[in-house]
Amino acid sequence: MKRTEIQQLLNEYPLVKNLMELEEIFWFNPCNTTLKEGLPFVGLGADDVEDAEARLDRFASYLCKAFPETAVTHGIIESEIVAIPTMQKTLEQHYGVGITGRILLKKDSHLPISGSIKARGGIYEVLTHAEKLALQAGLLAENDDYSKLFSEELRRFFNQYSIAVGSTGNLGLSIGIASAKLGFNVSVHMSADAREWKKQKLRSHGVNVVEHELDYGVAVARGRKEAESAPNCFFIDDENSQTLFLGYSVAGGRVKAQFEQMNIVVDEDHPLFVYLPCGVGGGPGGVAFGLKLAFGDHVHCIFAEPTHSPSMLLGVYTGLHDNICVQDIGIDNITAADGLAVGRASGFVGRAMERLLDGFYTVQDQEMYNLLGLLDRDEGIRLEPSALVGMAGPARVSGNLDYLNNKNLSAEKMKQATHLVWATGGGMVPDDEMTKYLATAKI
């Protein structure tokens, strides 16, 4: 961006200056509206989510066989929700803010197969593609027992096809592991910030890892180019895929069912706040969409990003979406939150979801490490840095009276609120890597 263009941007959107200075900010989204008004802009509906849920149910018997660790949940890839009462007290002291209601942790960090939120969308898109190919070839019918896909005959069939994806790490893990298990030839284009252990894990599953010295956007572009030039190659587009988005959106109904089992009420007097780490936007966007369908206007979805990679906040705040990247305003897009190191957010997700999101905030890298250390100390739960950006959310919301007043969230309602922090990854981090994370925490 030219200096004059940046100055014009600053004149119109003063918070851009705070972003450029890498400050931690909270921005309440004035475009936020009701589900009824916002839903038409998404281009998807409850029927699409139900279709995704049904597809995952069909694949449950296959997943049980292919990944025995899913047998305990009968082939359903789902995570538990846990209370973190000691951490809640610590957060109040840490931020000097009273947090009423209850903080819960959604442990997508410990999802089976790939240990992150990407096990939802990534694996779902691979399964969707596999189903389509097998149905077209007459090797599968929708009323079949899908465990038949776990056979040498089907592996040989899928081996004629390849899959490519660009990733900062976790999406590549989920797609690589699931694709290789089915028999696909799979290439994962990894950006410069991808962790070495994630590359090694993929290689151990027979995945072709292509390393790039530049950021996420380049990795995606190279993956797309490879798919265009190779016959029978399917590219999974993290920036624009509605299939990925729907895989994540199934989480909304699942959370609703879990809350019912836990006797947690969500209504006008019992608001639900969900804090979602955001990279390119597909994961949090899909989850937020599913939550909105499940809980309507009683759920308040808030995206959290690193100060060095606030791509979705920048895109939605300026209305430029994927026509601007953080590098345009001089931000380096280098962060310890490797899963969130995205300079240019998804234009599809930003435009689809901007009216259904309450707000956005940013967190510094050191603060992620500090929260990581506190959570380990208080609750014995270990996450990767990017999964901790959501942990700052309850204090940010509780301390923002303008936001609470605007949303008519009285002190009485906040006493009955549920704060759900979405832990996006970390369950498979090797011990030596985790030791380094913990050593970086200042607590």
From Swiss-Prot:
The modification N6-(pyridoxal phosphate)lysine is found at residue 118. It catalyses: D-serine = pyruvate + NH4(+). GO terms for biological process: D-serine catabolic process; isoleucine biosynthetic process. It holds the Pfam family PALP. Its cofactor is pyridoxal 5'-phosphate. Its EC number is 4.3.1.18. GO terms for molecular function: D-serine ammonia-lyase activity; hydro-lyase activity; pyridoxal phosphate binding. It is an enzyme of class 4 (lyase). Keywords: Lyase, Pyridoxal phosphate. Transmembrane segments: none annotated. InterPro entries: D_Ser_am_lyase, Ser/Thr_Dehydratase, Ser/Thr_deHydtase_PyrdxlP-BS, TrpB-like_PALP, TrpB-like_PALP_sf. Monomer. Belongs to the serine/threonine dehydratase family. DsdA subfamily. This is D-serine dehydratase. It comes from Photorhabdus laumondii subsp. laumondii (strain DSM 15139 / CIP 105565 / TT01) (Photorhabdus luminescens subsp. laumondii). The gene is dsdA.
